[in-house]
Amino acid sequence: SYSNEMSVVADTIGGIDVAEAFHILHMDKRWTGKPAAMSTYVYPGCGYGGYCLPKDTNALYAVTKTAGFDAQILKNVIATNDHMPEFIADKIFRHIGDNKEQTIGILGLSFKPGSDDVRDTPSAKIVRELNRRGYNNIIGYDPVAIDEFKRKYTDLTISYVTSLDEVTTKADSLVITTAWPEFKDIDKKVNKPVVDCRYMN
């Protein structure tokens, strides 16, 4: 949540390379070794997702508040992550403008790479926010999670393609929402706007 908030801060202030800032942070020797593989958690993205982290954070906050303590960090962790889809939709708008006829390609549907788990995935929240703003020409691609996403999120206006080549060809702009390795350097391979919400490139 801190890293996501820092991406908003960097974007708001301007002139800050948030990816470089976090690469420098990760050079601290206290982040190395086992079991301290924390660098993947302390990096900006689309907000948390998956089954455990959102549920457990909300539960911990609720239990703590019921017990009489309004835990501000937990409260702000929830608020920051809940705000990310709106922030990312604003970022997409700044890159592609108000042309709602253009096709937006969503790169990644699972909540993390290496998994087909789409529970509480940021991709669904971002697509929902884009739909709410009138962007309905959306195509999604994921190496493994298309079927799961399609089954779970029937309320979204989105179609699907089965290859990276197809989404990069059909879309007018691309949005990276899951850090799959195959999306690395996609901005150098296509001549169209790429909104890198995972700060891979």
Residue ranges and their predicted role:
Residues 1-201:
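Structural/interface elements that position substrates and couple domains in central-metabolism enzymes
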